Amino acid sequence: IAKEVIGIKPGFKHFATLHILNTKRGTFFLADTSINHENSTEELVDIARLTYDAVRYFAHYPVMAMVSYSNFGSNPEHGPIEIHNAIDILHRDYPEILVEGEMQVQYALNKQLRDKQFPFNKLVGKDVNTLIFPNLSAANTVFQMLLEMGAAEIVGPIQIGLNKPIHFTSIDTSVRDIVNLTTMAVIDANVYEKVTLKK
């Protein structure tokens, strides 16, 4: 409904959501955790671009990995062709976005292991702070697991890609999460107003 009523940001065909995880290892961003079910190449490109902008908005430099069950085409027969194609498009058309994949989560989050096994990767020496998942099932399962395990303070879902500030909550959203999302909505509204007035 939000997509039809509010519309998508210019230059995109899809919107998404992300969650912010504050952990002992630092802050991480996960997308897309609530909207797109089985991501096509086009959807993955839009999700990566929107997430890149959002992470920068939160004053972090996005180092992004598209995660899967295989690494850099190691399973050519059943590998995630959508991720391969999305990575190719992002590297070609959006070179400012530092993204690589596909790779398993352990290689995304362990740069020593990643760089030793795959020295050709474009993230050499860098710590990944942003994970893009191949589908909603994987993304939502991971963040729900971390939430229940108490492994991180989680903020979200934060919508990215709609024309106006809007955020979603579920029936079991905590008061703290509602306060966090309300704060973000106010900030988003102020930014939106300033951008609108400049036009």
What are these language model-derived features?
Residues 1-81, 85-199:
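Anion-binding alpha/beta catalytic cores of soluble intermediary-metabolism enzymes, centered on
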